[in-house]
Amino acid sequence: MPFITIPDMHGCVYNVVTEKYLSIAGIASQSKKTLPPNSVCVSCIGTAGLVTLVSEKSQSNQQINAITPKEGISPYYVYLLMKTLSKIINKLGQSGSTIVNLNKKQFSKIQVIIPSRSILCNFDILCNPLFEMILSNQRENIRLVN
């Protein structure tokens, strides 16, 4: 199973390839931490404000906060919303030390506007084919490189 770390989050929309993978024993030891596809990963320590979507069941390290959208909430909306907030996330984590650190409590206090379900549904209908194409293109690029 892919194990997402901050280096895996640079320059991509989806985490298609990761540097590290978990063994069966590793997966079993943290089974409640498995992220479903289209969860949104946000880096909050070190290089704070990186945002990616999970392409397949994965787990991540503690430097990453993951958002699994509820039924009826577009993961693409959440992804794009977090992308627009990435500079704010980075600033909130700056405390005078050299390492940016936005803890889960601070992260959960970020206020956002969530449109109505009908707007989110229409947004999802428009964005879904685009994000499917992005994922397909990322996978194709990896196949071509290998």
Summary of predicted features, one role per range:
Residues Q62-I64:
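Glycine- and aromatic-enriched periplasmic loops at the membrane-periplasm interface
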Residues P7-H10, I45, S86:
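Short, small-residue-rich loop/turn micro-motifs
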Residues P2-P37, S55, S60:
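Sequence-specific dsDNA recognition surfaces
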Residues T47, L53, R117-C121:
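Long mid-to-C-terminal scaffolding/interaction modules that assemble large complexes
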Residues G72-I73, Y77-L80, T84-K91, S95-V100, ...:
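Amphipathic alpha-helical coiled-coil/heptad-repeat segments
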Residues M1-P2, I114:
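Extended boundary segments
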Residues V13, A28-C44, L50-V51, E71-L80, ...:
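Polybasic, glycine- and aromatic-enriched phosphate-binding surface used to engage nucleic acids
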